[in-house]
Amino acid sequence: MALHIHRAERTDVLADGLGALLATPPADPFAQDLVVVPARGVERWLSQRLSHILGRGTGSDGICAGVSFRSPASLIAEIAGTGQDDPWSPEAMTWPLLEVIDASLDEPWCRTLADHLGHFADGEERELRAARRYAVTRRIAGLFASYARQRPGLPADWLAGDTAELTADLAWQPQLWRRLVEVMAIDPPHIRHAKTVALLRELGAGLPARLSLFGHTRLPATEVELLDAVAAHHELHLWLPHPSAQAWAALADLRGVVARRDDDSHRRITHPLLATLGRDLRELQRSLPASVETDEALTGSGSHPDTLLGWLQSDISANAVRPQGRSLRTEDRSVQIHSCHSPARQVDVLREVLLGLLVDDETLEPRDILVMCPDIERYAPLIAADFGLGDVVSDGHPAHRLRVRLADRSLVQTNPLLQVAAQLLSLAGSRVTATEVLNLAQSAPVRDRFGFTDDDLEDITRWVREANIRWGFDQEHRTPYGVDFVHNTWRFGLDRVLAGVALSDDSPGWIGNTLPLDDVGSNSVELTGRLTEYVERLRRAVDSLTGTRGLRDWLGSLAEAIRLITRVGDADAWQISQLEREFNEVLERAGSRRDTMLRLPDIHSLLRQHLAGRPTRANFRTGTLTVCTMVPMRSVPHRVVCLVGLDDTVFPRIGVADGDDALARESMTGERDVRSEDRQLLLDAIGAATETLVVTYTGANDYTGQPCPPAVPVAELLDAL
C-alpha cells in the first residue's frame, strides 16, 4: 500500500478528484470508504458535492452513500483504541492532575505552583489565589496534552530524567508529569503512540482498505507519524488545498522539523501573500513523510476570471507578481474592502453590498454567499437584526426577506438554560447588582416561569430605578463586602414597591424605615407578587451555590437552582435534555474523582471550559445565506465570500503567550500557532471566492472617531492589490 498526495488550488477540484476515486467501488459491496474532514461545514459541502458524482444516472441527481465521514480526533481515537474516553485528554487528565497537585503543594519542587495557588498565603489573599485551583490545573492539563501531541519527545525525555532543555522557572513541570504518570498507572501518551505506530506498521489498523484525508492545512507531528504508519497497509490519499503548485515545487526539497526561527522557507516564496499568510501550508509540506507514492497536482478545467480577484488568485497560483499589461475596469467590484465606523456599521455595509450583488445578478442565490466572522458571537445579534426578519417586519428593508442561517454558535448562546446556569454562577460570586438580576429576568425560561411580559419588564425596570435598588439582596448579603446598611438593596426596594401597592396616595409618608413608592397602582398587585417571588427564589438559588463540596453535589445544586427559577414548554424540552446531557458528560469525565472538593470559582471555570468552543449542530449548506466562524467552511468555494469584523484588535487572534508553555520557548515548525492559523484562513478565503471577495473592518475609533489601521493581514492584502 502507499501514500498518495493530491493538490489543487480549489477544493471543488479536489472534491471532483475524490469523487472520481470513490466512483470505483471497493471489492466488498458492503464496505464503506472513509473520508476524514477537518470540520462539519466541509463535511456537509463535500457530501453534497459528491452526490453529484456518485450514484447518479444521466443527470446530477445522485446520492452520497457508502462514505463515512470522520473527524481527525475520532479516527486517531479509533486507531489508538481509546474510543471517546481518552484518559490523556485535557478534560479527563485534569482530575488526576488536580489530585496530584493537591498532594504535592508542600514539596520543595512544587513551590512555584504552591505560591501561585496561595498555599502559603493567609486570609483574603489565600482565598483569592485558591480560586484559581481548577483553572490552573485545566490549563496545565492542556499544556501536557499539547506536548504529547505536538512534541512527544519532550514528555518522554522528562520520564527518562532529561530536563536539560528547560529553564529553571519550568523545572516543576517534569516532576509534576512524572507524578501524574505514576497516579494514572497506564501507558503515557508517547509510549501508547509508539506502540500504536509499531502495531500499525506490522498488522495494519483494521480500517477500510482505502482512506482519504480531505482539506487539511495543518497536522501535528503525532498524526503525521500515525498516517505514515497507516499507509503501510492501506491506500491513504491526502487531498490538500494548496494555492500554488509553483510554491510547492520551490519547497520540495525541504523535509523534517526545524526550529521556527531557523525556518527560512518564506525566502523561496515570491508572492507576498503566500509568504506572509501561508506559513501553515509550508510547515505542513515539510512535515509530510518523504515516502510518497504519488504527488499529483490537479489543475481543473477553469481559468481565473479577468477581474481584480482573478488576477490576485492567478498571481498567487503562479507565485509571482505580474502587474504588467493589466488595467482595472471601473465597474470591477470583485474585491471590496470597506473601512467602517463600528461593528454595526459593518453589518449595514454588508447588507447593502449583498443586496446590490443579488440585484445585479439574478442567478446569484443566498446559498452562493458565505459570510465568515472571527467573532461570531459579537456579530450574531447585529446580523439577526439586519437580516431575516421578514416574518416580523413585513414592509421593512429588503434584506429582511433573505433567509440567513447562523451556524457554529456556542451551546451557551443557543440553549437559554445553559445561559441561565452561567448567569447563576456569576451571580453566586458577585454583589447581585440590579443590572444582573434584570438581565436574568429577560431570559426566556425565567420569563416563562414568572409570566413576565415585555410591559412587565419595563415596569419592573422603572420600579428598580425609582426605588434606587443598586446591589445586594439584603443587609446580611452585604456584610462580607464591609457594608452594613439595608438601603439600596433588593429587600429595601421591594419593601418600597409593596408598600406603594398596598397604600393609597393619601397615606402617611413613612412606614417605619420604608417610604412607599409612588405611581404603583393597585392593578400592579399581581406583578409585584411575581417580582417578589422571583427575587426570593433567586436568593434561594444563589444561597445554594456556596461553600466547598464535590462535583456531583455542585451539579445537583446548580440543576435544582435552575429548576427553581425557570420553566420550559414542551416544544423546548430539548433544552432540559441537553442541560442534563452536558452535566452528565462532566461527571463521566471526572470518573471516580467526581467527589473531588471544589469551590464556586472552580465549578464556574469548569463549566465555562466545558461549554466553550462546543458548537451547535452543523447548520451549513441548508440553501440559505450561511454565517459562521472562519474555521468550519474554510476553503469551501462560494461565488461570494464575505469576511466581517477583521479588526486590528481581533484578527489575527492575539494569542497571549502562556508563560508556562515549554513549546513557546522554542517553537518548532508544524506546531500550532493561532496567529499563523488565522492568516492561513484569510489565504484560504481568498482562494475560495470565485466571483467576489468582500472584507469589512472597523476603521475608526468608536469614541473619538480617529482613524484606526486595518488588521495587518488586511493591510498586506491591500498592499498586494
Q: Which functions belong to the PLM regions below?
A:
Residues 1-721:
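Polyanion-engaging groove/track-forming segments
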